[in-house]
Design a protein with these regions (language model features):
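Hydrophobic residues in well-ordered beta-strands that form the structural core
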Residues: 93, 118-120, 248
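C-terminal helix-rich "cap/oligomerization" subdomain common to oxidoreductases
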Residues: 26, 59, 67-70, 116, ...
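N-terminal Rossmann-like dinucleotide-binding module
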Residues: 1-48
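A contiguous active-site-proximal alpha/beta segment in oxidoreductase catalytic domains
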Residues: 98-157
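Contiguous beta-strand/loop segments that form the cofactor/metal-binding neighborhood of enzyme cores
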Residues: 172-254, 283, 288-295
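Beta-loop-alpha module in the N-terminal Rossmann-like domain of NAD(P)-dependent dehydrogenases
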Residues: 16, 46-108
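Mid-domain beta-loop-alpha active-site segment that forms a flexible
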Residues: 121-128, 154-186, 200-202
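C-terminal glycine/acidic-rich active-site capping loop/insertion
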Residues: 123, 234-308, 328
Length: 328
């Protein structure tokens, strides 16, 4: 049995908590959030357990938990992560790692070389369709092109002030692309954005080119009408090579493979598990199970979820934002 602490009980913190409640080998011992309303929600969820609740982290650092899940706001990630690492803790940190790469790099002296004490919550790395895609790619030739789209509702622009689509949503595609190219550094980046007339950014485009000729084009936007059906948001990833392509429509349960003119669909089954109703919930559960296995010394942090990977990806995001603004 591993004991965990959760820091930040907003939407993502509660999402993690609900999955943790279904895991037999885990006990949530501590929940921390400076917002009293969030703590009340946590008390309701864990009403029957022996969980402690606190408005501040320092008061519960000595509880002796095995690992921490940090799901607080991005602006607080570095301070909270540093405090826990200095106390000898192990962390699963929600994306993005920080507001800037320079902030993220300040943690370097505290992170193990293999990143065992800091794993990033890059959830799509544990998505069954993405894992099936990586398996299929092992039987193919080299990747030539990558295309990803991630549309969201128009109210994202106002719900997350100060966040652009590059850092809020495109980051998911950047870390999956990072894993697909084995962490290789692109030789060229370019980016464009549209600034909304009422403030903020609602469309972001990015292009990345690698020395071996791989091209990636990514788009993230906040253009879906607010009252549209939930399934209108169609996140997709498409990988192309010489004579073949594989399309991954997230959460649809299949891959579409085009090979030498023939089109086939490969099914991806969602296993029946209590508390798991869709592929994203399944991915979060898989991610949490990996973190527990990491605490038990049974696995390593995968490429794309290591501290050094997160720093490199944040450097990409910083550069893309600057390029889109015309500052670079």
């Amino acid at each position: 049995m591993k004991t965990l602490g959760i820091v930040g009980f907003g939407g993502m913190g509660e999402f993690h908590a609900r999955q943790l409640k279904q895991m037999a080998d885990v006990h949530v011992a501590v929940v921390v959030d400076p917002d009293g309303k969030n703590l009340e929600r946590a008390r309701t969820l864990f009403a029957r357990g022996e969980t402690k609740f606190s408005l501040n982290l320092e008061s519960v650092l000595e509880e002796g938990v095995d690992g921490w899940i940090v799901a607080s706001s991005t602006a607080t990630h570095i301070q909270i992560t540093r405090t826990i690492l200095e106390a000898g803790g192990c962390i699963l940190l929600e994306k993005p790692i920080a507001a800037t790469a320079s902030e993220a790099l300040t943690l370097a002296p505290l992170v193990d070389a293999d990143s065992k004490n800091l794993m990033m919550g890059h959830t799509l790395l544990w998505h069954r369709q993405f894992q099936l895609l990586t398996k299929e790619l092992k039987n193919r030739g080299p990747i030539r092109a990558i295309h990803a789209t991630r549309p969201r509702s128009a109210d994202h622009r106002t719900r997350y002030p100060g966040e652009t689509p590059f850092s809020l949503t495109m980051v998911h595609d950047l870390y999956t692309v990072f894993a697909l190219v084995g962490g290789a550094q692109p030789k060229k980046l370019s980016a464009q954005q549209r600034e909304h007339q009422l403030g903020g950014v609602d469309v972001a485009h990015a292009q990345l080119t690698w020395p071996d000729g791989v091209l990636a084009g990514l788009r993230a936007d906040y253009l879906i009408p607010i009252d549209a059906a939930a399934d209108v948001a169609r996140d997709e990833l498409e990988i192309s090579g010489d004579g073949w392509s594989i399309r991954l429509p997230y959460d649809k349960g299949f891959l579409e493979v085009v090979d030498q003119g023939e089109v086939t669909k490969i099914k991806c089954e969602l296993p029946e598990r209590v508390g798991v109703n869709n592929f994203y919930e399944d991915a979060v559960r898989n991610e949490l199970e990996h973190f527990i296995a990491l605490l038990n010394d049974n696995v390593a942090v995968p490429i794309g979820a290591r501290y050094q990977d997160a720093c490199q990806i944040q450097e990409w995001i910083d550069r893309l934002i600057a390029l889109a603004k015309g500052d670079d």
